[in-house]
Amino acid sequence: MIYSEIIKRGSKFLKKNKIKNPYLDTELILSKVTNKKREEILLNINNKLNNIDLLKFQNYLIRRYRKEPIAYILGYKYFWKHKFLINKSVLIPRPDTELLIDETLKYLPIDKSKRILDVGTGSGCIVVSLLKERPKCTATAIDISKKAINVAKTNAKLHQLENKINFINIDIDKYKSYN
């Protein structure tokens, strides 16, 4: 089946279940399956998808049809100015949380070395975004979930900040006495 037909059928399928952005989500899923940017897919709209990839596409589409968030299906979410890997072990970074970055940056002078504490780090998107903006700073990021810490460590490494963040798998109440 060619890309244009896949997009047409996929978006129609998602629209039946009142998925908010059926066309975009279908394109994003096709992009994941083909490992191509959306623009490249649209420029090659008559390319065919092989049967194995078509099955993968259909499985992802069914997950989206069942209202699984597109970010969990894709395995990433953009936050602030960066791409963060995510999975079901962490919450999906929300656009309104970017306000926290804006406000925090007002209190972190660009030329000063400060220490940041990120409690409940999850994907690490907040601490990584802050350190990208304030390279002289360092941080400690804590989370009760070992799986979340692993996701955050992966994101720190992805953004080449693994040496600037001390990750601790601990409950906040225990951290007080730990520190």
Which residues fall in each region the model found?
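A general structural signal for well-ordered alpha-helical segments in protein cores
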Residues: 7, 26-27, 57, 67-70, ...
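Short beta->alpha junction loops/turns
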Residues: 19, 89-90, 131, 145
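A general secondary-structure junction signal
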Residues: 28, 77, 169-171
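Conserved AdoMet
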Residues: 32-107
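Conserved SAM/SAH cofactor-binding pocket of Class I
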Residues: 98-179
